[in-house]
Amino acid sequence: MTDTVQTLIPTLDVSERVARPKVEAGVKLRGAEKVARIPVKIIPTVDLPKKPDWIRVRIPVSPEVDRIKQLLRKHKLHSVCEEASCPNLGECFSGGTATFMIMGDICTRRCPFCDVGHGRPKPLDVNEPKSLAIAIADLRLKYVVITSVDRDDLRDGGAQHFADCIREIRLLSPGVQLETLVPDYRGRMDVALEITAAEPPDVFNHNLETVPRLYKAARPGSDYQWSLTLLQRFKQMVPHVPTKSGLMLGLGETDEEVIEVMQRMREHDIDMLTLGQYLQPSRNHLPVQRFVHPDTFAWFAEEGYKMGFKNVASGPLVRSSYHADEQAKIAKAML
């Protein structure tokens, strides 16, 4: 089912390279500045490819969208919906839900598929767990996804801050279901998992993002096997909590590679899967190599269920937290 795809990403000519900026604490680098020092350089896309009809989304403008944005500003919170330019922002915000991003909006990684800014983060806001809990109570949410930037500057990678947020939220909203979408805790897996197991979420999510062949280009600083091991070890420590992971398609992978990664996920006890289309945030990000047809996404879902995934969300506009409440309900019923 796979066409031949271009997988090599050319290196910028020395004369064309962006000058490497000095990164100061609290300064957010995006676009060309962000990816200036990654191993595989990005040539800015001159003409962005036209999106097929099945990718078109409604412009996220509505009173409910504005209300939630105002509430986030009031409590000095960040939503990954905005920071990562999610195509489902309008639908999710209009439905009165949001995925909250904790530990600031500056990431210590430089992944060139991602629209979140890079830099040296400021110290953690010790009031954030309480502010997040108050915002969730104000919104009267029943299902909440909490994610974060990577914080390689922290000894535990931010695991304790996740746990503090979970504790505060459950104090103010005892009935809420919580899903965490965590970083890879590079070099800190043991301590991070000990903390997480002591205050576990209702769903534990960590995205592999792409196939291992593309990690150097798409996830510099991350390791494919490390991420698989993180998910499996959590499952071994807290077996009653569903584990979840996801991939973006369109970065240059083949269908066969996607199937192989899905099989590896099942070998590492991952219960839930999300597959969605990669959309290039700007001309300075990794280019889209292909737009995967909805029929192919449907085929991946069929194959996933055959492998034993409890739930598979697979479609062009699917993102990790898209309809996460429905995904979790189905997966938990099957555990």
From Swiss-Prot:
PROSITE patterns: RADICAL_SAM. Its cofactor is [4Fe-4S] cluster. Its EC number is 2.8.1.8. It comes from Pseudomonas savastanoi pv. phaseolicola (strain 1448A / Race 6) (Pseudomonas syringae pv. phaseolicola (strain 1448A / Race 6)). HAMAP family: Lipoyl_synth. This is Lipoyl synthase. Pathway: Protein modification; protein lipoylation via endogenous pathway; protein N(6)-(lipoyl)lysine from octanoyl-[acyl-carrier-protein]: step 2/2. Binds 2 [4Fe-4S] clusters per subunit. One cluster is coordinated with 3 cysteines and an exchangeable S-adenosyl-L-methionine. Its main location: cytoplasm. Belongs to the radical SAM superfamily. Lipoyl synthase family. Gene3D superfamilies: Aldolase class I.
